[in-house]
Each structure stands twice: as C-alpha cells, then as structure tokens.
Amino acid sequence: MAREFSRTDRVAQQVHKEVASILQNEYKHRVGDMPLITVSDVDVSRDLAHAKIFVTIYNSTEEEGKVQIKQLAEYKKFIRSILAKRLRMRSVPDLHFFEDKSIIEGMRISNLVSQTIAKDESKRDQDDSQEQE
C-alpha cells in the first residue's frame, strides 16, 4: 500500500526543493559573495499561508549568520515571486527564514567526542608503555 502524505508535507517538500534551487542559482547571482547556504527544513502551516524555512549557513560567524538571515528576509519578495512562477498553487506561502544551527552544532559535538576518544587512547597507550617498563 502506498504511503499517504498530507498536503502540507507535499507542499513543504516542493517549497524546500524550489527554494534551495533559487538560493543556489538566482539569489546567489543577485547577492554576490555569500557563504554556503543550504535549506535544511521547511515547515508549512496547515492553511498553507506561511512557510518557515530553516537554513544552515556554513563557514560563517554568528554575526555573519544573522546578517545572512536578515538579507534573506529582505529578498523574500524576490524569492517568493520566483517560487510563485514555479509552483502550481493558488497562493504561495509567505516565507520566514530562520538559521538552523543543529547541523553545525552536531558537527562540533562529534569533533569534541572524537578529540576526547583520541586523548583517552593516547593516555591509555602511555599508561601501557609505563607499565611495561
């Protein structure tokens, strides 16, 4: 049996795909120099009037991330107009951009765990070599 998806899930998936494409192509050419931005998630309201777009901004400081979110908010009419041309909907959701730090935070935690494991192994190796002497 086919898996059922709600309309909001299908719209969110389509908005995700199209906004990612817009950011990669049209927005990038308008803004110029910008860090790598990926769309990590999209939540669409039940009435399809609003879409929360969570973006991950790589290789940027916290301040640069805030500037990029502000810049995305300034260009949301431009992004929404292109989105309206690509989607076959009566009305396109209003876009709200948020910075998603979960991926970067996960990478940071993973690095900390790896460093801790490496320190423990080197300490264990030192202890083993001292016991053998």
Curated annotation (Swiss-Prot):
The keyword Cytoplasm applies. One of its GO terms (biological process) is maturation of SSU-rRNA. InterPro entries: KH_dom-like_a/b, RbfA, RbfA_dom_sf, Ribosome-bd_factorA_CS. One of its GO terms (cellular component) is cytosol. Keywords: Cytoplasm, Ribosome biogenesis. The keyword Cytoplasm applies. GO terms for molecular function: ribosomal small subunit binding. It comes from the Bacteria. It is found in: Cytoplasm. Belongs to the RbfA family. One of several proteins that assist in the late maturation steps of the functional core of the 30S ribosomal subunit. Associates with free 30S ribosomal subunits (but not with 30S subunits that are part of 70S ribosomes or polysomes). Required for efficient processing of 16S rRNA. May interact with the 5'-terminal helix region of 16S rRNA. NCBIfam families: rbfA (TIGR00082). Monomer. Binds 30S ribosomal subunits, but not 50S ribosomal subunits or 70S ribosomes. This is Ribosome-binding factor A. It comes from Alteromonas mediterranea (strain DSM 17117 / CIP 110805 / LMG 28347 / Deep ecotype).
